[in-house]
């Protein structure tokens, strides 16, 4: 929705200004996503707070990026795919092969069986709007994940979807 106003500190609604000022102070710039989310101060707060929670969940940073890349790719947000690919690459969170597999939505091409199961489960969550089959859930658990992490995948998909749709 890039047709919406991309706010600056000067143009942001009063309720969004403290958050947008903090982003500017911490990053030295205001990403377009933040500027657009400032149109709805509650959406900006949601993004920032859920983002903190998502980053602190029990999935590894690499696993979080698998969820984010797959969600962005599924939602056809090239900007988000590129951003999460760059983050995963720069921080060495995933192998080159795993990044390639996530970007291609090719769960079977991961070089790590557990990440492959995560990718398959994330794709199922998105395709079935959370109503995964018993077999899909069992495969996720059999790969070493647990109920908490199943819900964390859904949280990651929700966060990614907000970003993907706003971008």
PLM regions: where:
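Mobile cap/lid helix-loop segments that border enzyme active or cofactor-binding sites
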Residues: 1-61
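Short acidic alpha-helix initiation/capping motifs at coil-to-helix transition points
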Residues: 24-25, 41-46, 76-81, 126-135
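Alpha-helical scaffold segments that form or flank carboxylate-/histidine-based iron centers
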Residues: 32-35, 61-77, 106, 147, ...
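Iron-sulfur (Fe-S) cluster-binding segments and ferredoxin-like electron-carrier domains
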Residues: 42-44, 81-99
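Amphipathic, charged-and-aliphatic alpha-helical interface segments
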Residues: 67-71, 113-132, 156-157
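Acidic/His metal-coordination segments adjacent to aromatic residues that form catalytic metal sites
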Residues: 104-112
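Amphipathic alpha-helical interface segments
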Residues: 121-125, 135-144, 148-150
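Preference for long, well-ordered alpha-helical segments
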Residues: 147-167
